[in-house]
Amino acid sequence: GSASISPGVLNGVFDSTATSGLHVIASTVAQSEVVMVPIGIRAAPAAGDPVFMGEFVQLGYHAVEEGGAIFANIPFGEWDVSDLLSHSRSKPWGVLIHAKAARTAANTAVGIDDYGAATALGGYMMYQIFAGDGTATITIEDASTNTNPNFAALTGATTGELDCSSVQKGVVDLTATRAVKRYLRWQLSLNTATTVTFALAFCRTITVGF
C-alpha cells in the first residue's frame, strides 16, 4: 500500500449568501478545490498557526438539518493527482500568514518566524479571497530581520491583480531554487478596492521531497 493525504470531511453551517456563502462556493462536486484548514492553538486561528492545505477532489455536498439548524457536510478525497504531477508540492502542512479578516491598507507590522532560518528551495502560497469592493493584489514579503523596513516582496509570491468583489482562490508556486528569508508577512496593494477580506498561507520547502 501507499500513504494518502486528504482533509476528510469538512463541516460547516449552511450559508446561502449570494456571492460568498458556503452553498455558493462548495455545492459543486467532482472537481478539484483549493482547501485551507487553519488549526488554531487553543484559540481562533492566527498568523503563525499551522494550516493543512492543498488541492483536493471534492466528493460530495450534503445539507442536513439538526436541532433547527442546517449544516453542510463536504467530503474530500485524496490530493488531486493532476495537481501533484504538474507541481512540486511535497507536503500539505504550511503556516498561516493572514487569518481571515478584512484589510483596508498596506501592512507595516512585523511578520512571523515559521521555521527559524532562511531556506533556498522555494515553496507555495495559497490564498482565499472572501469579499472586497474592487481590484487588489495580495503578496507575501520576506525579511532577514523582523522589522518593517527590512521586508520586501518575495519574488513569485503574488496573486497578481484580482477582482476581489467575487470569491477568488488559488495556489502560487515558487521556483524550486527560490531563496526564502526567515521572516514572512502578508502585504496588500489596493487598486480600485478599499477593503479586502482574505486568508493567506505559505508552505516552505525545507528539503528536496519534503
Residue ranges, per PLM feature:
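Short, surface-exposed tryptophan/glycine-enriched loops
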Residues: 167-181
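Surface-exposed beta-loop interaction hotspot
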Residues: 80-109
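A short beta-strand element within beta-rich, extracytoplasmic domains
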Residues: 119-131, 184-188
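Extracellular Ig-like/FN3 beta-sandwich strand-entry sites
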Residues: 5, 32-36, 120-122, 135, ...
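Short beta-strand and beta-hairpin "edge-sheet" elements
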Residues: 37-86, 178-179
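Surface-exposed ligand/attachment interfaces on beta-rich extracellular proteins
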Residues: 1, 17-20, 98-119, 130-139, ...
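Predominantly extracellular/luminal cell-surface or secreted proteins
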Residues: 40-42, 139-146, 189, 203
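C-terminal interaction-tip segments
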Residues: 189-210
